[in-house]
Each structure stands twice: as C-alpha cells, then as structure tokens.
Design a protein with these regions (language model features):
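Intrinsic-disorder-associated interaction segments
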Residues: 1, 76-79
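Short Fe-S-cluster ligation motifs
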Residues: 49-55, 79-100
Length: 100
C-alpha cells in the first residue's frame, strides 16, 4: 500500500526547488512538482509521497536520470537533502505531523 496524498502533491505548486543541483536548477517555481526520491516496492512503482521533494523540472530530470548530470550517488545526495527540506516545509504547512 502506497501513501498517496493529493494535498501534498498539490502543495508543490509555486514552491521553490528544494533540490538545487548546481549548474542544473532552473530556480523557476512555476516548474516545481513533487518528485519521488528512491524506489517503490516494485518495478515501475513510485515510493510514498512522504519520500519526495519539491523539485524544478531541471532537477527532476536529473533525479529521474532523463538527463545525465553527475554520478547517481551525487544526485541522490541532492535529492535526499531536498527531501529533508521538503519534509520541514510540509510540517510547517501542517500537511504532515509528528506524534507527540
């Protein structure tokens, strides 16, 4: 079962890119979407929406390896750092919560 949230996906609209790959990021908030980081549970499956980052179209292309820029490991570091920043924003927007 995947964790899918339309509210989290829609929250990406107008946000700043949180991946910020140097010499790649277009810094255009109009192109930002919720990009999934990592693998799902099977071939062709996406991971949960909580394992995602706000990414501009250029950074998203590199994360998904449609554009080859840097090593896969280097790209994943940027993606995971972006995921952490995105999770902080989702907490601030009260779209996710941590149990007390």
């Amino acid at each position: 079962m995947s964790l899918i949230s339309k509210k989290i996906r829609n929250s990406a609209r107008g946000q700043n890119c949180q991946v910020r790959i140097p010499s790649v990021c277009n810094h255009n908030s109009e192109t930002v979407i919720l990009a999934h980081v990592g693998k799902g549970s099977g071939m062709g499956q996406k991971c949960d929406d909580i394992h995602a980052t706000y990414a501009c179209s250029a950074c998203h292309d590199v994360i998904d390896r449609r554009v080859r820029q840097g090593s896969a490991n280097e790209v994943m570091v940027y993606a995971y750092e972006g995921m952490v920043r995105t999770q902080k924003l989702l907490l601030e927007q009260e779209l996710i919560q941590v149990a007390k």
